[in-house]
Amino acid sequence: MALPKLNVPVYETILPSTDKVVKYRPFLVKEEKILLTAMESEDNTIVTNAVKQILKNCIQGKLNINELPTFDIEYLFLRLRAKSVGEKITVGLKPFPCAQNDGKLCEKSTEVEINLEEVKIKKDKSHSSKIMISDDIGIKMSYPDISILN
């Protein structure tokens, strides 16, 4: 007797760098455990590898995570987190010196709620990866990928 197949919702998003449609599922308990374990280590390499593994597990179809620009990975992870845990997060700013308090630390921290579904990538229409040095010579640049983080 075969094990039952879990039915999980599948979502789509568009990669900012290529406008390619990517299908993904929310992360499950096993992916959340990978992330929590990595965050406890406080080692950037372990956290980066955990994010890559979670994306590989949750993205459907062929997509090479190692070749994606870092902003695509961050965007995908935000979308994944929004569908898995919840769209809204609360970000707290620590007390900081402010002019209204004669340069002393403000007494209260500031909390801001962010809806991850509303996070958008703004692309300049004139953006190009080509940089012309002269009329005849140019350089084609590439976006940094996740390997630069290790």
Per-range role (PLM):
Residues 1-150:
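Long C-terminal interaction/binding lobes of large macromolecular proteins
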